[in-house]
């Protein structure tokens, strides 16, 4: 058969193609040399008469014969065939070339394409025969055959091709006036000129293209499968591109799962689908004897498809993966699995592993790619042998550390899959061995040669680069582009060299590698990595074995980190390298100009780290999983929080420690209250799934918190959350209700105990019945439980009543039970029975209804019911009588019955009046009569609610109730003020818009208001308020009684009455749509009672939401002051409304009203007649605390609360507003600059302008979508930051800079101490725009130099602080490492004295003088600075039973384990406090170790639980503590002064006389820094204790010295020029000065104690040290005019004199002298001066002169 086919083929060639020999040999040779590319030259050189004949039959027959030869499988040499046919091979190639060229053009007809396909099939088939490599196979012709195949593939894949013109757009068509035409067959033809060529494949039918492809692919498979000769790499790549196009033709879900292999051409020919043929192509390439084909097949065909890379012709390269690419990836995974199943050689397995690693390392950071690629790799690793899988995990360990976010994310996801699906318990099989030693040696030799060549090339390149640099410098010195190019080349070469250097990484256990990937992902800085880490950790925690192994791994790796870097704390990702121990700035991190302000926080963190390292404390928590869970659940990204919900659920499901369980459960509760809706819903799902699990150890705690959390979500602002919470609640309650247990009744009773929870559950049950989620069996089970008479019946009745209403059943059972209940006792069951009865009236027969009505009427007539039942029972009676509503039938009868009850009520009040007159009788019957009164008033209130028409007929009842409510103990005229902030007719200032209120005082002494003494108890009067309010709501004529109610808010001492009045005012304002009583509700925020303040906040919020009140004026100010309330609930209510409700409705509220708050809090008043009215500026006069400014810390707390919610734009707007509304008016004289309140306002404004909190952070690039994870690139952020800086600078130059410079000139003219703060404000602007200082201060060179010096000084001080900390951190770290090495040594060794001792060098300060002084004191303090040593260290060396049980923590807590003593730590803290710029913050950081006493916390908690909570007077600030921190704590002289300053003699008679003034002042001044319940101390919102310091006299020199620069004071700390503190009792024996100066009379102690003023008079008009102190205590401060200067104590500071001298040595010899002048002598001199009418200032001057004269005499004696 082979010979016949061979012969037939040769005879066919001889008979039909022998004419080809007529072609010139030179043409054939030249065509072969040009690789058959110059077709035009060929056509011009050859006579085409033979080619132009109809040769289609010849070509088809040739294709048939060639194909039959190939399919036969017999080997025949093609050279013999051509020799027998006498046809030249080169000329046959010309024959094929002609038809290939005509069949592949875009304008080729289908006949030409058919001829070209036949020629290509014949040529490829003949090339597959042996001997074709000699002359037949030509690369040019083969590539043209491939092009014909690709054209057919393109036609099949996208359908019949539409012809398009090259580079001819629609605009050109219109401009040329030409259009396309359509022929009769519907085909589009192009009528444009010949100049526009047509591109694309030729137009043929799809069926024809598929038929052609079947022939062409069969011949191509035969060519590749024959392996007769190798193909060069470019041709092979072209072949693979064609094969890849074949694999895309009919790819679908069915074909993607198959990987068919063909063993022969005959089998390949039987494959119908192109996808199956593609798989056969891949198998053939991989199994080829030429290794290059297998390598290229894996690299070019398989790897891109596994990596889901786009195809070359795909224009859409977006992040979304097409369906075709996903199916292709699945197909190639099946191909690899098929190859692995055939037990391939090690070389092919190595190829598969390499491809897998490449796909893994090139994964982009996109979720869709990551998920699919992880699935592909997992399937491949499952099929690979264990050795290759283990080795791949080692690759993950190497690549995870240095790759991008995509590889890290894929590693995290892949790790979770491998952990759960693989068993790596087997030992490490080792690295995969080399495949061929000889080949490796050859490759090594080749690589060495290549390395040598590369080194030579690199040397040549370096020489060339140097020559280029020299030429650039000589020829083009100013050419910056060439320099950039040279630097780029260097950087590229450095990167290449670094890439070649591969660091060896040791092999680890596979599970440890996977655990480490998850562990590091949870702690990663990128939010996307933390998200993947959380998801992976969730899967780990679900398995007990993996959970324990992961916990063990975390403990091990942390121990290694501690050993390497030192135990730093609980921050898992920090080391000493992060601490920058060397003191040099890291090169990788570039600082922004504004990063100077962030160094302060870093210094504080370093100092805290130093203290922890020095103490040697072990980690607070060893449960690393617990720490990671807490960290991820408090993340700032919403997707991470949602992933953390599942993580919390997994952790709580196995947690067995109660404390950790409670903490994690509280975090889950916080997630259910998150501001993101999706987070709240996810948290609720996790909470509910936990609740449905049975294996929870702390089920009771879980149930309670789940109940409160989910029911609270029923009141969510988002409807989706509410609906979701309702479904989750029923998901838990439905099985519990159907199968009742103790947990069921406990949950129901817990819900029933809270009113809001009860209402939410009732509505939820109603919806559940409507949706058929609850069955009737639940109602029956509740009924059986009620009949059984168990203890827990409230919850059962709650569910039973609602189900009875919904199913309309069991009304008879409810009536029967109701008839047996004692209504005179309080019971929650009554309301549920009434609920069933009133909603099922149609089910009640007439007789039963009549009997029930009579029973209820008799109950009301006799008042035989508890007051709590009056509302529900009266409403039920109205329903039974059909007397409620406009369409009621018996409304008249119901109204008449109500009037009867009102008459009965009035008679009861009269009876009580008569009984009240007889004190004995009232004492006996007061309890029963008041209970009767409360019931009668409650019933009357319900009557007025349902029958408002009865109010005008019973107006006397309202007046009587007003008389009862307004009665006081001692008469209204003498009553003490409970709330002095309540507005009244006695205005202390002109009336404002909202403060004009009706008069609340009686107009005459007679009438009803003349009754003396409180009538009845507070409870009766509180109920009377409710009844009176209902009457006012029903009848507007009774509004005249409102002033009396308002007056009770001011004078009534019963908080129940005031609380009901607040609620009544809110209802009246809501009903009558009036804001007349807005000031009263605002003033109620200052009420002593907590319940009154909370009701006031709720009523104000409700009325503002209704649009009746506006959030401005007094409401705006007092609501903000409520955020500083002493009670936590009041604070939370106020902050919740301001931050959540108000800011959501008005986002720009704080920026618009920031200055208004400042003016109101400081009580600064503009001068009258300055040209602008305050109302024009939006300012409202609100008097707070009698016109005194609020305490400074309280003001700062409010400013900080507002600033925290501001963004960059809002901060800048606030700064502009401060300049326009504060700085400019003060400079223009619109404010009285000498006024103390104005000084406070200006001080606050400058502090805010100079504070770090108000810095424009340049926060750009934030994604408004909070679910987004990807952040913008650094380049984009840098460009945006630069642009915004220019914009802000432009506005700074226009508004802020001119205003603040004019203010500086104004302060300089007045020589104000605020000049320093003004410079700080200017310095903040210069820090924000560090590179634009020349432009900002271009007109003031001196100020510019000052600012440059300030910035340099801040930088130097920060560097000094960092240097000090870095040095000590390094020393402590080395000491700890040495201790660990010694502890691990086998023999006990004594520690050397040198490392244990501290260095004698003291901590360097910011002042050179301080350093010199401390160097002198080093020798004296050397012994004190050493660490305490044990008395007998030799006795502690051996381990005894006593010390053998000592824990590691105890050993580390001993003094021997600390390098630095507490005294050294104290010095370091003081040094840092002097160096860091705390003056640039609203809340300066505190380096002191503050600790809150537990007894104080318990006392504050007990105070919160009291029923009546009264706010006491204002407490002082922490100014004294701040001054102690600033002053020299280390000086013994200062310690003595502090002790002396605190000692104050007992109060004199004159001070006792001032108590009355104190009380009167306290009534007027109620607002304070932090309200408290103790007169001696207070606990603020942060839990810090504030003590009342006693008043200490300060001399003017002392106050000036306190306000001086910190560095200056530090430099003079050890000198004798320190100003002394005034000594109250100077009776003690004096030292040398007293002994030498005997002529100076001493003052008597008795006169000093009896003097009414002990504080002295300051000669300064305004002192900065007292600025912003506010009202610290209730003691009235007398003015200088009223002060009696009979006894004045002077403290002279001679440092001002010695500072100006250059003789520094003399300053230490100067001694401080304190002179106390006798009060009698001073008084005598004052009397003499007053006799001649001398002014007091002159008297003071004379006294000062006298003292100076005596001082000179003393110095002369010395």
Swiss-Prot record:
Record keywords, A-Z: Cell cycle, Cell division, Centromere, Chromosome, Coiled coil, DNA condensation, Mitosis, Nucleus
UniProt organism field: Caenorhabditis elegans
Protein's UniProt keywords contain Translocase: no
Protein name: Condensin-2 complex subunit hcp-6
Acidic residues bias (residue ranges): 438-462, 474-484, 1414-1423
Residue stretches of biased makeup (Polar residues): 969-979, 1602-1618, 1640-1651
Coiled-coil blocks: 1326-1385
Domain of life: Eukaryota
